[in-house]
Amino acid sequence: MEIRGALDLRKRQVLIFLVLLGLSRAGTESAHYSVAEETEIGSFVANLARDLGLGVEELSSREARVVSDDNKKYLHLDLLTGNLLLNEKLDRDELCGSTEPCVLHFQVVLENPLQFFRVELRVKDINDHSPTFLDKEILIKISEGTTVGATFLMESAQDLDVGSNSLQNYTISPNSHFYIKIPDSSDRKIYPELVLDRALDYEQEAELRLTLTAVDGGSPPKSGTTLVLIKVLDINDNAPEFPQSLYEVQVPEDRPLGSWIATISAKDLDAGNYGKISYTFFHASEDIRKTFEINPISGEVNLRSPLDFEVIQSYTINIQATDGGGLSGKCTLLVKVMDINDNPPEVTISSITKRIPENASETLVALFSILDQDSGDNGRMICSIQDNLPFFLKPTFKNFFTLVSEKALDRESQAEYNITITVTDLGTPRLKTEYNITVLVSDVNDNAPAFTQTSYTLFLRENNSPALHIGSVSATDRDSGTNAQVTYSLLPPQDPQLPLASLVSINADNGHLFALRSLDYEALQEFEFRVGATDRGSPALSSEALVRVLVLDANDNSPFVLYPLQNGSAPCTELVPRAAEPGYLVTKVVAVDGDSGQNAWLSYQLLKATEPGLFGVWAHNGEVRTARLLSERDAAKHRLVVLVKDNGEPPRSATATLHVLLVDGFSQPYLPLPEAAPAQAQADSLTVYLVVALASVSSLFLFSVLLFVAVRLCRRSRAASVGRCSVPEGPFPGHLVDVSGTGTLSQSYQYEVCLTGGSGTNEFKFLKPIIPNFQVHDTGKNMGEIENFRNSFGLNIQ
């Protein structure tokens, strides 16, 4: 990890070096302009676009702006014309004081790509200040014994202008004793000296009043005056003297007010009043007089107002010692202000972008500069931001930095970054400044809507009301704003036969699904379709999910009786021999239910019977069987009503009516099996032989049964009355008799049997076997069969 970190650091250093190299080449171009102070706001300075070789459109598109070193807006760049204009009146004397030339430094910053141009604006001085004297009156005491040619220092005037507009000369009002001399000065300042041109006589003139005039070099020149009061004293031949001409002290800028700075002491060899010395500042500026004070008796210099290294680094104080005779001496006190780390770094934001798109990399977030008013290590700074942020600082030139995104961001992971720019100096103790920037990551449509489930299963009970809400689908989008607004729709079904548009609809805003019409389980048990979720981004993104609708069965179908038919025609009659044993299968009620599940579970029960207890119905399969042995006392004709009920809630039911005819000596006939399929006819010879043998035995058995029945009926016809059955007048309908012995119609042979009366013979007529069907037989055919039955058996069936 340490090696990797070192490599990353080395890469960053190389990148910063290349950026600084490019910027240093781009920043070597500079422009120089000048303007007179006090020029009106909005005055033209220069056409910056022309001087920099840039088009006006380029200035606007690249967001050109002017940034000064002290972060003050002295100039304004008109992006429409490219003109550089004054944004405020400039006072050269306030900006630069006595410094000449007075040059203000600016940077022209262009973006896309980032480029800097240096601009220097020289503020030219105008003669807007007159020379002024700090003292309205200058008192000079001169002994009458002073020799001709003696010089006397006087307070100089102050002129805030510089150059030719500054103080140039002094004149004295006409008199017979003095003239003004301007000596050469190492600091090139003009100091007036009063020179004695003619000896004074205390007795003749003890006091002189002269006017000292200071004249500058402006056009027209300006001047200032002060009164010079000269008092003639008696002879004093020794002037005060200082041990050294220059005193140097170092004072930290945080020295408390009233603190002692230094003590300056002079000696005078005279005695008495001429030896008494008083100390004063002379040629002292207003800053010196405000900052320091001197004890006129002891010569102690004390601090009067706070020191600030960042404003003034040193003070040169001229101190004059004057004795009682008017003689004086001078020395210089040099006070050097020591810097302490009392100024935290300053952060100035030139431009800032608080919202950046998430898919943009290396986007400029902020351009800022840092400044520390201290000096040395106290003024050296380190600029940094937090670790583990996808941003980095890129130094440009001097103390300018750019805050740039390191890579493309992901708003869904983090939508906001709080970046703290920390600037720390290297002083003791270290001071730091923090500047917080909140960067909002604007959304880009990079996430498709996602359904909460890949598939949905909805349940809908049939016979629903139209427009019924059957369920909902839901999708979420990790984006924000319009990019996260989801619209739902139905996708074309994969099955072209599915009329999806007439079955369901979806609310485009919330994903609610509605059934458009009532559904029938018996027609449609289930269907599936796809729904889509599309956001409103550009380009729009979408996803889909599968919806499966299961139609739940409702108990809306009553049982339907397949057999016996209940179509309003003449009912079928089942023949039961009186010799039948208990449990004899009379018939089987077959019913179906169009519903499903427990709604289609059918149960059977005997609802009504002509003779209760004679017959019973099996509840689960509908088989009607005899419950006991039949006797001669039992009626020959019986009517049974069987109730068929489903297991729904509430249950639905149907009834089947059966007619049963008790017959003496009747037994189940035997008929050959139906012809086999063509494929079975090709069985081997052994199978054929077995079938032929079985058919022969069956025929013999059938013949015996028929003979037995015929004999039996002939005997009874004379001894007993003819049995009656409630067969309606008209044709006697055919019926189906189950002879399989298993009670299952699907595995039985069924024969159409017709019974007729009116004949003197008691016999049955069997017709050909038929395939089960539930169509009503032809009435004419039934009538013919009934007539044949009557003729054959001689029965009178009513």
Swiss-Prot record:
It comes from Pan troglodytes (Chimpanzee). Gene3D superfamilies: Cadherins. The lineage of its organism: Eukaryota, Metazoa, Chordata, Craniata, Vertebrata. Keywords: Calcium, Cell adhesion, Cell membrane, Disulfide bond, Glycoprotein, Membrane, Repeat, Signal, Transmembrane, Transmembrane helix. It is found in: Cell membrane. Residues 35-133, 138-242, 247-347, 352-451, 456-561, 568-671 form the Cadherin domain. Pfam families: Cadherin, Cadherin_2, Cadherin_C_2. Residues 712-798 are cytoplasmic. It is a single-pass type I membrane protein. This is Protocadherin beta-14. Disulfide bonds join 96-102. Potential calcium-dependent cell-adhesion protein. May be involved in the establishment and maintenance of specific neuronal connections in the brain. Residues 1-26 form the signal peptide. Residues 27-686 are extracellular. GO terms for biological process: cell adhesion; homophilic cell adhesion via plasma membrane adhesion molecules; nervous system development.
